[in-house]
Amino acid sequence: MSFRSIVRGDSTVDVKDVKQVLRDECGFDDVDISPVDGDNWLSVPLVVNDEFFLKVVTVQNAWTHSLFTTARNLGARVSGNGPFFKTFGSPVEMARHEFESARRMREAGVRAPEPVEVIEGDGEAFLLFEYLDGFETLSDSELDGETVREVFRMLRRLHDDGLAHGDFSLENVLVVDGDVYFIDSTGVAEDGHDDAVAYDLACALGALSSRLSPSVVVDLASEFFDAGDLRHALDFVTVVRLRPGIEESFSLLELRTAVAEATGDAS
């Protein structure tokens, strides 16, 4: 069995049980459930009646999140920063954090699916969001300058409001009719906000540089982040390059060179 299989484990859910929970707790009469395709580690995503997006968070998902968080904090320490990622003690704690995070992002003017309800089940948790019909993840979308600019604008807005995403990736950005939405943020300690902001920026620079020229990505980021922000982000790019889903998909040398040129640090 591969390490990936061990970490992911078996986090399948009984659809009949899910339907019953929705009937009992949310007052649904007819419940039609369809799975969402994707490489999902931290929840089981489902679409309900083509109206709601449901994330089922299992004990296995919570364990996997804890393992990932430990690895990220270790990476932050190795880079000379952190640790600043928070762990959660249970599936319902994870779900409540994501509910609150989405609510706060929307209050800050950052587009995110509207959170509807958190339901505590028998060990697992159920997190209900509005369903964004016709969405694509950024990894599946055509990337252009305006979309990338909007990603950095929203990230800046998030940070200016004292928030951080903590798990930025192309899969955690949705595009609907040209509008950009953030999803799946993780927990960040308040006293680690500055480092978390730099980590967010490093993730965005790395992920977007896997699709576009690093010089183009850095130029667009520079419209919203100053030289100090870009330099601080470089503290984390080596760690970011090890993340599942990014995994050496961008050139460290090219990204570092692009940042050096943008900040005037090129020799």
Pin down the residues of each PLM region.
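An alpha-helical support segment within catalytic cores of ATP-dependent transferases
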Residues: 17-25, 29, 120, 130, ...
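Catalytic activation segment of kinase domains across protein kinase-like and atypical kinase folds
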Residues: 121, 128-131, 135-137, 164-206, ...
